[in-house]
């Protein structure tokens, strides 16, 4: 396995989701932008005491035509300088995001176009930066 690429284990993906403030998409998704927006709506960053200001994490995954996850998601980037505990907290948050959202409600056209192809999304935790007034 190459440096910077971490496979999310099945144990992390089956982590229980409790009290999620995120929304699961309801309407059929027709575009890649809608897929990104749906995944971001399902993402809940780690608690502030486990987070890092400006933390970025990128995950690559593939879907089946019906919106189910195909294979295992892979972390392809994490902010430099994050501690192992911070990285783990964000990996768990990504796994919970996927668990909340999957399967995604793809339209037939989007499902046919996206099936089996890599889909990458970057998530950025701006919460502490917003509090400091550094992000709009």
Question: Where in the sequence are the language-model features?
Answer:
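A short, polar/charged loop-to-alpha-helix boundary motif
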Residues: 79-91
